[in-house]
Swiss-Prot record:
Enzyme class: transferase
UniProt protein name: Methyltransferase ausD
GO molecular function, one term: methyltransferase activity
Binding site for S-adenosyl-L-methionine: D127, I128, N155, I156, R247
EC number(s) stated in the UniProt entry for this protein: 2.1.3.-
């Protein structure tokens, strides 16, 4: 049985009084680097059109699914290159390893990799919303660069979905940013196990995460009454991977750190911070 999906969670939250407009930020007046340069150089958008282009795509996306990362323009603040594991990720992909951005939204982090020299044929993205993947092409204007067959609309909890049909055991790296918190703790264990199955069953297979965490779980996770998410702290994150190892029998080396992030400054919920983590198969 497939567990509750994010869009079902949102419908439940709206019914319980959650107002998505608190997640909607006024239109941008400037697009920060490196996104601005990527849109100019990679997407060939004239510099004087970049801001209006981004605003239009954001509004269309927020109408499809009102996530905070969309309403607050988090998708223009690229994060993958800030990971201390990015040099390894980029080098491995340049050498033929395959990388999946899970919960990729517009696939913006994939475009960072491509801009930095990664071949599009080694990159994959997946999101539950096909419209997000389509809007990614509208944002970056690059259908010729990133194969459409490499952007897969799937539910990571559904092992019969195209993601598993096409990629089980074939990936070397999975990047997960601001995605896992939309699942409860038990569902996150399932997601982690499924991700391990997508990766090659060999030492060095790597998961790199950017995780929404909180200082006071008791307070913040109480928001589950309206938006049933699960926010980690460092201890619960480490516990998650201990459980995953016990249930799967796969030995993992888990590296975790707290990292500065622009998201923290504008997140509407209290006590938010960002955990970075790398989970390597031993």
């Amino acid at each position: 049985m497939i567990a509750m999906q994010p869009e079902t969670q949102l419908k439940t939250a709206l019914k319980n009084g959650f107002d998505p407009n608190i997640l909607y930020k006024d239109p941008l007046t400037i697009v920060k680097e490196p996104m601005c340069t990527i849109l100019e150089k990679h997407s060939k958008i004239p510099v004087d059109k970049v801001v209006s282009h981004v605003n239009k795509v954001r509004d269309r996306a927020f109408a499809v699914f009102p996530y905070a990362c969309i309403g607050q323009f988090s998708f223009v603040e690229l994060s993958i290159a800030a990971s201390p594991y990015y040099p390894e990720m980029l080098e491995r992909v340049k050498n033929g390893h395959k990388l999946l951005d899970l919960g990729c939204a517009f696939g913006q982090e994939l475009r960072q990799l491509i801009y930095d020299g990664a071949p599009g044929e080694s990159l994959y993205g997946s999101d539950i919303q096909q419209e997000f993947l389509n809007l990614g092409y509208e944002l970056f204007l690059d259908r010729a660069t990133l194969p459409e067959s490499h952007l897969i609309a799937s539910n990571i909890l559904d092992r019969q979905s195209p993601l598993f049909t096409h990629l089980t055991g074939k990936l070397n790296i999975v990047y997960i940013s601001l995605f896992l918190h939309v699942f409860d703790f038990e569902q996150q264990i399932t997601v982690a196990g499924n991700v391990l199955d997508l990766l090659a069953a060999e030492p060095g297979s790597l998961i790199v995460c950017r995780v929404t965490a909180c200082r006071d779980q008791g307070v913040l996770n109480a928001t589950a009454e309206r938006m049933p998410y699960y926010y980690h702290d460092r201890a619960s994150w480490e516990q998650l991977w201990e459980v995953v190892q016990k249930r799967t029998g796969v030995k993992l080396c888990v590296d975790t750190w707290e990292q500065p992030d622009e998201l923290v400054k504008k997140h509407p919920l209290p006590g938010i911070y960002i955990l970075g983590s790398a989970i390597r198969r031993v």
